[in-house]
UniProtKB/Swiss-Prot annotation:
<keyword id="KW-0496">Mitochondrion</keyword>
<comment type="subunit">
    <text>Component of the mitochondrial small ribosomal subunit (mt-SSU). Mature yeast 74S mitochondrial ribosomes consist of a small (37S) and a large (54S) subunit. The 37S small subunit contains a 15S ribosomal RNA (15S mt-rRNA) and at least 32 different proteins. The 54S large subunit contains a 21S rRNA (21S mt-rRNA) and at least 45 different proteins.</text>
</comment>
<dbReference type="GO" id="GO:0019843">
    <property type="term" value="F:rRNA binding"/>
</dbReference>
<keyword id="KW-0694">RNA-binding</keyword>
<dbReference type="GO" id="GO:0003735">
    <property type="term" value="F:structural constituent of ribosome"/>
</dbReference>
<protein>
    <recommendedName>
        <fullName>Small ribosomal subunit protein uS17m</fullName>
    </recommendedName>
</protein>
<dbReference type="GO" id="GO:0032543">
    <property type="term" value="P:mitochondrial translation"/>
</dbReference>
<dbReference type="Pfam" id="PF00366">
    <property type="entry name" value="Ribosomal_S17"/>
</dbReference>
<dbReference type="GO" id="GO:0005739">
    <property type="term" value="C:mitochondrion"/>
</dbReference>
<keyword id="KW-0687">Ribonucleoprotein</keyword>
<comment type="similarity">
    <text>Belongs to the universal ribosomal protein uS17 family.</text>
</comment>
<keyword id="KW-0689">Ribosomal protein</keyword>
<comment type="function">
    <text>Component of the mitochondrial ribosome (mitoribosome), a dedicated translation machinery responsible for the synthesis of mitochondrial genome-encoded proteins, including at least some of the essential transmembrane subunits of the mitochondrial respiratory chain. The mitoribosomes are attached to the mitochondrial inner membrane and translation products are cotranslationally integrated into the membrane. uS17m may have a meiosis-specific role as it accumulates during the middle stage of sporulation.</text>
</comment>
<dbReference type="InterPro" id="IPR012340">
    <property type="entry name" value="NA-bd_OB-fold"/>
</dbReference>
<dbReference type="GO" id="GO:0005763">
    <property type="term" value="C:mitochondrial small ribosomal subunit"/>
</dbReference>
<dbReference type="InterPro" id="IPR000266">
    <property type="entry name" value="Ribosomal_uS17"/>
</dbReference>
<keyword id="KW-0699">rRNA-binding</keyword>
Amino acid sequence: MKLNYVGIVISRAMPKTAKVRVAKEKFHPVVKKYVTQYQNYMVQDDLNCNVGDAVTIQPCRPRSATKRFEIIKILSTANRMSPASEISKE
């Protein structure tokens, strides 16, 4: 059984590669509160997602020296406006 993670795409600087940030909540025993910890993963992006998209990733065979995950589904897309549409509204 493969573990699936849900995260947000934070970078698309390279072709077919995206950087995804996954948030995990961990209980801190001293302060007795839940603390959010973030882990960034380099993932194989065959679905051509954009920055800000919520995606599901799962482990796969090593694709490169740093890529060990792949995007299997885009859960929601980011609400981004193009610069031309912003200028026309003003």
